[in-house]
Amino acid sequence: MLFILVLLTSFLSILYLTAPSIRKFFAGGVCTTNVQIPGKVVVITGANTGIGKETARELARRGARVYIACRDVLKGESAASEIRADTKNSQVLVRKLDLSDTKSIRAFAERFLAEEKKLHILINNAGVMMCPYSKTTDGFETHFGVNHLGHFLLTYLLLERLKESAPARVVNLSSIAHLIGKIRFHDLQGQKRYCSAFAYGHSKLANLLFTRELAKRLQGTGVTAYAVHPGVVLSEITRNSYLLCLLWRLFSPFFKSTSQGAQTSLHCALAEDLEPLSGKYFSDCKRMWVSSRARNKKTAERLWNVSCELLGIQWE
C-alpha cells in the first residue's frame, strides 16, 4: 500500500513538473490575422469574465467599439475599466443583459438599437454549465433557456442591424460536449429526466444546429455565422458545480488560459475569406468535424421552429 502511495505521489509530482510543457502542447491554434477593425461595432455576451473578457480585450485592442453585455453590471464595469486601461481604447461599454429573462434581452436590444446604427460582429459567448435543475424567468430549463433560447432571441432582435452593416458575422460558442447532446423534443425542459451534464450537452448541440440553420437562412445577405469550441479552459463557467470546480482546480495546470480559449472566437470574428465556411464548426482556429446529430437538417429546421414558438416570435 505504501509503495502504491509513493508511486502515485511520484507520478503526480512528475505530471505537475511537466505541466507547462503539456499545457503548451495542448494550447491549440492562434488567431494569426493582423486585421484591424477601427470603427467596427461589436457585441459580446458574458464578456465581464473568462473567454468573453479576453475576446473583448483583443477586439478593443484592434480598434473596435465593444459592448460588454452581461448580467452583473458591476463586474462588467470592472472588466471594461481594465480593458480600456490596457488597450487605450475608451470605446468599451457595458450594458445589462440577463439571458435567463426575455424581458432583459428585449430591453438590451431596444437600447442598443437606439444607440447604434451599425453592428458588425455579434459574439454569443455567455453560458451556464452543470446547473442543478432550475428554470429561467420564462420557465425554460436553464441550460436550454440561457445557452440556446437566450442567444436565439438576441440574434433575432439584432439581425436587421447586422444585415444593414454587412459584411457582418455571428459567432456562437458551442462545445465538444455537443457529442453527448440530443435534442429531445418531447422533453426540452428536462422535466421527465434530468442530468446537468447532458443538459449542457443538449444546449451545445442546439448552438450548432442554430448556427447551421442561421447560416442557411442568411445566404446572400452578407451576414455569416460560425460555431466555436474554445477548448477546455480555466474559467468561471464551472461555478455551478462544486465537483467541477474541484476538478478544474486540480487539473488547471493543463487547461488553456482564457486568452488561449479566446483564439478561435477571434479567428471566426476576424479571419479573412471565411464566408464560404458559414455555418461550420471551428476548434483551434480550424474547421472541425461535428456529430451526425449536429448535421441533421430536419432537426435543425424543427428546432428553429420550436424555438420561435417558445419565444413567441416569427422568424422566416
From Swiss-Prot:
Its keywords, alphabetically, are:
Lipid metabolism, NADP, Oxidoreductase, Sensory transduction, Vision
Q: In which tissues is it expressed?
A: Expressed in the inner segments of the photoreceptor in retina.
Instruction: Give yes or no: UniProt keyword Amino-acid biosynthesis.
Output: no
The active site annotation covers Y200 (proton acceptor)
Q: Which GO terms describe its cellular component?
A: photoreceptor inner segment
Look up the record and name the pathway of this protein: Cofactor metabolism; retinol metabolism
Q: Where does substrate bind?
A: S175
Q: Does the keyword Protein biosynthesis apply?
A: no
Positions contributing to NADP(+) binding: G46, A47, N48, T49, G50, I51, G52
Q: What is its EC number?
A: 1.1.1.300
Question: Catalyzes what?
Answer: all-trans-retinol + NADP(+) = all-trans-retinal + NADPH + H(+); 11-cis-retinol + NADP(+) = 11-cis-retinal + NADPH + H(+); 9-cis-retinol + NADP(+) = 9-cis-retinal + NADPH + H(+); a 4-hydroxynonen-1-ol + NADP(+) = a 4-hydroxynonenal + NADPH + H(+)
**GO molecular function terms here?**
11-cis-retinol dehydrogenase activity; all-trans-retinol dehydrogenase (NAD+) activity; all-trans-retinol dehydrogenase (NADP+) activity
An example Pfam family from this entry, by short name, is adh_short
Question: What if the gene is knocked out?
Answer: Deficient mice are fertile and developed normally. Deficient mice exhibit normal retinal function at 6 weeks, but they show increased susceptibility to retinal cell apoptosis of both cone and rod photoreceptors induced by high intensity illumination. All- trans-retinol production in inner and outer segments of the photoreceptor is not affected in deficient mice.
Q: Which Gene3D superfamilies match?
A: NAD(P)-binding Rossmann-like Domain
The UniProt entry's sequence similarity note says: Belongs to the short-chain dehydrogenases/reductases (SDR) family.
**Do you know which NCBIfam families this protein is assigned to?**
PRK06197.1
Reproduce the miscellaneous comment text: Shows clear specificity for the pro-S hydrogen on C4 of NADPH and the pro-R hydrogen on C15 of retinols.
Protein name from the UniProt record:
Retinol dehydrogenase 12
Q: Which organism is it from?
A: Mus musculus (Mouse)
The gene name reads Rdh12
